[in-house]
Amino acid sequence: MIEIDHVTKSFGDYVAVADADFSIASGEFFSMLGPSGCGKTTTLRMIAGFETPTEGAIRLEGADVSRTPPNKRNVNTVFQHYALFPHMTVWDNVAYGPRSKKLGKGEIRKRVDELLDIVRLTDFAERKPAQLSGGQQQRVALARALVNYPSALLLDEPLGALDLKLRHVMQFELKRIQREVGITFIYVTHDQEEALTMSDRIAVMNAGNVEQIGTPTEIYDRPATVFVASFIGQANLWAGRQTGRANRDYVEVDVLGSTLKARPGETTIEPGGHATLMVRPERIRVSMDAPTGDVAAVRATVSDLTFQGPVVRLSLAAPDDSTVIAHVGPEQDLPLLRPGDDVFVSWAPDASLVLPGADIPTTEDLEEMLDDS
């Protein structure tokens, strides 16, 4: 187990990580996700030993290693640039670590052959790095980092140098390799798809703070803050006020020019308090007629349509001029819509979530965060 015990890291007056407090289980695929400057890489560097906490402690298997040098910690790091030895074969690159530890030849061969089999590079053992694709080079770097059996492997945006299609392939390869070797992987990324695809749990970070830790499903379906909701996936976020409780299970919020029943979040909001209602675009139904049953519904006017393959992305204007985004698939069986058409948009109360506050990041804010990552 790895414990981050109330860790703060400051550089002068700048606080890069503020009171981070969480643990990572042995054998877990744990991701730290967030925009540039959120503190994820600094946290990884403190686990690796490249930075020292200003406050708090880092423990590996119960031992405080906060001031232990990197070479004395049983962890290895894979960076975006793999730093393979160009003059060595794949086999010799992987064997470098065990040789430097002066293991026996038989043990070295056993370990290297085992790792090359796991990363599916046995047939490439005699090639040089320049003869490999980017994905193959990355798997060599993984094998080299794993061959000494570290207690944890730290990965700092290792897929960033690959093209989009290869990144998708390598996401599944990384998860497969992690399951086969059973070693803790701690993965840093600003790419939400990578984190959602591979992780057992995710820590979402923003401005030095850990905003939420949970499984991919928990992070996506029940974000704890407006930032998490806006950063993970696509979400409709409408600012309003919570007026009270509808019943034991739901609250009422004034948004979109209506009072709507919605699922409360984890944070208690007093009646009249600022609130944000979140609904994912894929949870919204669009209909020509007023919906029936226990749903939240408002009138809306089609502003724009974009074909996106399996769905059509509809942008609609609500009565209060707020924008509603809906992803409409063929199962909704709608007639051909055009800008200016009046429709109803609706969703089940369980498909919504009320979050505290009404400070919603703009699209430009999020794009700037990601551009800097």
UniProtKB/Swiss-Prot annotation:
GO terms for cellular component: ATP-binding cassette (ABC) transporter complex. The complex is composed of two ATP-binding proteins (PotA), two transmembrane proteins (PotB and PotC) and a solute-binding protein (PotD). The gene is potA. Residues 2-232 form the ABC transporter domain. Its EC number is 7.6.2.11. It comes from the Bacteria. Keywords: ATP-binding, Cell membrane, Membrane, Nucleotide-binding, Translocase, Transport. It is a peripheral membrane protein. Gene3D superfamilies: 2.40.50.100, P-loop containing nucleotide triphosphate hydrolases (3.40.50.300). SMART domains: AAA. It is found in: Cell membrane. This is Spermidine/putrescine import ATP-binding protein PotA. Part of the ABC transporter complex PotABCD involved in spermidine/putrescine import. Responsible for energy coupling to the transport system. Its main location: membrane. It catalyses: ATP + H2O + polyamine-[polyamine-binding protein]Side 1 = ADP + phosphate + polyamineSide 2 + [polyamine-binding protein]Side 1. One of its GO terms (molecular function) is ATP binding. Belongs to the ABC transporter superfamily. Spermidine/putrescine importer (TC 3.A.1.11.1) family.
